[in-house]
Amino acid sequence: MQEQYRPEDIEQTIQEHWEKNNTFKVTEDNNKEKYYCLSMLPYPSGRLHMGHVRNYTIGDVISRYQRMLGKNVLQPIGWDAFGLPAEGAAVKNNTAPAPWTYENINYMKGQLKKLGFGYDWDREVTTCTPEYYRWEQWFFTKLYEKGLVYKKTSAVNWCPHDLTVLANEQVIDGCCWRCDTPVERKEIPQWFIKITDYAEELLNDLDTLDEWPEQVKTMQRNWIGRSEGVEITFDVADSDDTMTVYTTRPDTFMGVTYVAVAAGHPLAQKAAQNNPEIQHFIDECRNMKMAEAEMATMEKKGIATGLYAIHPLTQEKVAIWVANFVLMEYGTGAVMAVPGHDERDWEFATKYGLPIKAVIADAEGNQPDLSTGALTEKNSLINSGEFSGLDNQAGFNAIADKLTAMGVGERKVNYRLRDWGVSRQRYWGAPIPMATLEDGSVVPVPDDQLPVILPEDVKMDGITSPIKADPEWAKTTINGQPALRETDTFDTFMESSWYYARYTCPDYDKGMLDPKAANYWLPVDWYIGGIEHAIMHLMYFRFFHKLMRDAGLVNSDEPAKRLLCQGMVLADAFYYTGEDGARHWVSPAEAIVERDEKNRIIKATDSAGHELTYAGMSKMSKSKNNGIDPQTMVERYGADTVRLFMMFAAPPELTLEWQESSVEGANRFLRRLWRLVHEHTEKGTTQSLDLATLTTEQKDLRRDLHKTIAKVSDDVGRRLAFNTAIAAIMELMNKLTRAPQETEQDRALMQEALEAVVRMLSPIIPHACFVMWQALGGKEDIDVAPWPVADEEAMVDDTKLIIVQVNGKVRGRITVPANSEKDYVQEMATKEYSVAKYLENVTVRKVIYVPGKLLNIVVG
């Protein structure tokens, strides 16, 4: 072990040792408890960012810790390699997406290895390879055969910038999740998977996920959006037509004053046939740049159709309107409007002068004032004929029962969740394995023709997908008949919905999964990724697992037992305003900063002399130019320092503020530890520790050591509080550096302490600990060393620190033997000068003793 800590001299050598010895390669072993730790796989964008580093460091620390507990630990990594950014990069760099992607994978793989992550690289999965997506295509055809896949023309969210469809989950505040372009609605043929068939199970099984964050489960519950209500059929006046609406508030049914239908509803189409004004409004609705999320805030618009519906209970006519806030793909494409008790309906009725009727009382049971808005509380019914006076639930049931008895109502459970549209009009994705025969019938591609391979040697024009532009690619033969392949590709969330299962058998070629391997490793024990995936990836991930279960591929109900959503990594952000008024963001590395005595930034400039505005800490991003390159930090400080900072700076679920001064602090601690181990080992081997002859000071130090082992074990193993675990080790280190090293017992105790410290830190700083463990005489690599176990006897205090109070005020502290009786403690307290002076010339009225903690002497 060299005297100075120089990561550049050790890290690469140790990484090569791990690779050569297959240190982290695992196979199924029924004699060992398995542990599957997984971080969400990265998109190969070209370079790792600090968010990746944090995610993967957390996963690696958990994995290494579990290995030290003797478990058979699987920690794989792979590449979510399809996706739109590759197409943009290919056009920009005049290449094809495939070589750009593979080049990025190669570079990022090197970055991961330099960070010392203990992956089983033999299980690496790349989702853009035919070996991977072949089984995704096969599974899709099986879902089609089971009736879980269908194609229909539907209104979709269309991104005019990326020229592709977006799932509802991919529309954020009316804009594309990827490029922030306002989303349009467009009707095109799409392939769907029936996630709605699993809505109830997806909802109910959230209750079994005890170790998932409540926030994620709440977001999924809200997205699934289960509601109980009644589907009601209205006759249309003067015709044989009917219309159906769904309501969760049948208690307000007597307050319906109009109904509204979507632009695509058959009644809207009928009304538009001879009315250009209605047709114009329908066209306007269809071209809206609108997603469901914006419906609540947009201006409500509508047009009367001239048609009327007959209220089933009152037989009154209510006007039918076409409205821009009703979507054909939600529910029945029609809603009943109760403007007295729904804010949106009130807003619309007020705008167009439609009747507003009160059928729910105010809190006092009186007629409510509806002049300024709707009353939305669920109070008792009024103005509702035979139902007046009933409370909300009784009114719900009575009206639902009456409508059902009349044959015009049916109780139903509805879901906000829509079926998963998996078609994308892009090139760089897995081809959808369906084809159209000459007679127009659509069939799945047979198993023996899978995979449908995506050609990789293509030219990108940035406008049309190469497989759509090449008519020859689509031509094929199925069962002897000419056919045309589907030219849409899968939503890339398909690949990331089952990769975790393929890691269990990446080379298996007899099927999608090897049941033996999959059922040994699954479910995942710890899954780590960002909260931003709560209602996209994590919903599809759960859904796909249930699909695979029902296909007999896995035998568990959920894909992951525990989920950790790590916080974002923040960094300082600076900008100056240019002559054009635009903000020009300057990298923190280029900012020259002045700070006050509290370390707050008071002034910043860049090398060109621009005075910079400090925009505070914000998420590292390209847009704010405040990303810190992990590669630079590894080259400057070493991988272990970066890893140590990541684990120490904040609890894993909270945001982490990148401060280079704190990185330097982590590096200083590492050097101190290295120096202490070096100084100790330079003095030669130590004798065995003789517990029977320890001095009081040595017992105290050993007690601190084993209490630290107990705390760190709990912090790392149960609480995932890595920052407090490291803080406890740092506190112990301070005591070790002050501990005398004059006797063989002193040195033997130091040996025990350093062996424990190095093992506790090895999941976090594995390279340095590898070397220090060897220097301390470890007979095998630290990678197979067990986690230290706290000695319960060593943690027992021989003495207790007692707080002494006089009349409830702290007057002193004394140390007494652990089993001391009250009289002895009182006697010792009265001999303590700081206490005795308050006992002069007074009478002791009472003495209260809390054993081992506190003595309160009450005087008068």
UniProtKB/Swiss-Prot annotation:
Protein's cellular compartments: Cytoplasm
Keywords: Aminoacyl-tRNA synthetase, ATP-binding, Cytoplasm, Ligase, Nucleotide-binding, Protein biosynthesis
A GO term from the CC aspect: cytosol
GO biological process, one term: leucyl-tRNA aminoacylation
Catalytic reaction list: tRNA(Leu) + L-leucine + ATP = L-leucyl-tRNA(Leu) + AMP + diphosphate
Motif ('KMSKS' region): 619-623
Pfam family, one: tRNA-synt_1_2
Short sequence motif named 'HIGH' region, residue ranges: 42-52
InterPro entries noted in UniProt: aa-tRNA-synth_I_CS (IPR001412), aa-tRNA-synth_Ia (IPR002300), Leu-tRNA-ligase (IPR002302), Leu_tRNA-synth_edit (IPR025709), M/V/L/I-tRNA-synth_anticd-bd (IPR013155), Methionyl/Leucyl_tRNA_Synth (IPR015413), Rossmann-like_a/b/a_fold (IPR014729), tRNAsynth_Ia_anticodon-bd (IPR009080)
Domain of life from the UniProt record: Bacteria
GO MF annotation list: aminoacyl-tRNA deacylase activity; ATP binding; leucine-tRNA ligase activity
Major localisation: cytoplasm
Catalytic class of the enzyme: ligase
Entry keyword Ligase: yes
EC number in record: 6.1.1.4
Binding site for ATP: K622
Similarity-based family: Belongs to the class-I aminoacyl-tRNA synthetase family.
NCBIfam families: leuS_bact (TIGR00396)
Protein name as it appears in the record: Leucine--tRNA ligase
Organism the protein comes from: Proteus mirabilis (strain HI4320)
Gene name, Swiss-Prot/TrEMBL: leuS
